[in-house]
A protein has these predicted regions:
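Short helix-coil boundary/hinge micro-motifs
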Residues: 1-160
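Cys/His-clustered metal-coordination modules, chiefly Zn-binding fingers
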Residues: 128-207
Length: 207
């Protein structure tokens, strides 16, 4: 069942950073908005595709959510609130302006929750950050998303956050191109559409 869901998924990962990919779970935000996180199961599926959950972990969370439907609904709303706050924060960054305090407050609330769950665990000859009591935590994916946002906001890469130049897209992405001149979240879709429109307009003007 999980394999079928992934094959028919509408999620795309063109942001080059986890938290930016999460903000891009709304299609055509400024024209004909299409919400991609319509249920807690959708949130779990996105988390699985983003490699935050294994297939077994995703399956367990779905079963857990069936037993805790009200809590799952609250987590979904928290996820959407966090996503919208992150979108506005990084949109402001991309445009060279300052985000609103209430948007940062939303992020800080989730980040504080995440850090309260953080722990350092040994892995082979090294150590890594993990989360305590995560197995049945319906909001466990939010911890990693909030940490991802905090990492990006405090990194040198913050200056490379961009907003897609396509008017019908406006997704966010991290520009990792060599000369930092990337304009589109995905050249194959938004870039090609923009070039086609430009060519059509020029051809019409010279006709």
């Amino acid at each position: 069942m999980a394999e079928t869901e992934i094959q028919t998924s509408l999620f795309e990962f063109t942001g080059n950073h986890l938290c930016l990919d999460f903000t891009n779970t709304v299609q055509d935000r400024y024209t004909s908005p299409r919400e991609l996180l319509n249920s807690y199961s959708d949130l779990v599926l996105w988390s699985q595709e983003a490699q935050l959950l294994t297939a077994d972990e995703a399956s367990r969370l779905r079963e857990e959510a069936k037993r805790r439907r009200k809590e799952a609904a609250v987590v979904l709303q928290r996820a959407i609130d966090l996503r919208e706050a992150l979108y506005r924060i990084f949109l402001a960054v991309a445009r060279g302006s300052s985000p609103e305090k209430f948007e940062l407050s939303t992020l800080n609330t989730e980040f504080s929750e995440a850090m309260g769950r953080a722990c350092i665990v040994p892995v082979k000859d090294s150590f890594t950050l993990d989360w305590t009591d995560k197995e049945k935590a319906l909001d466990r994916m939010l911890w990693t998303i909030a940490r991802s946002a905090a990492d990006l906001l405090t990194s040198e890469g913050l200056d490379d956050v961009r907003v897609c130049a396509a008017d019908d897209c406006r997704w966010l992405f991290l520009d990792t191109s060599k000369n930092h001149s990337r304009r589109w979240c995905d050249m194959k879709s938004c870039g090609n559409r923009a070039k086609a429109r430009k060519h059509y307009t020029q051809k019409k003007q010279t006709a």
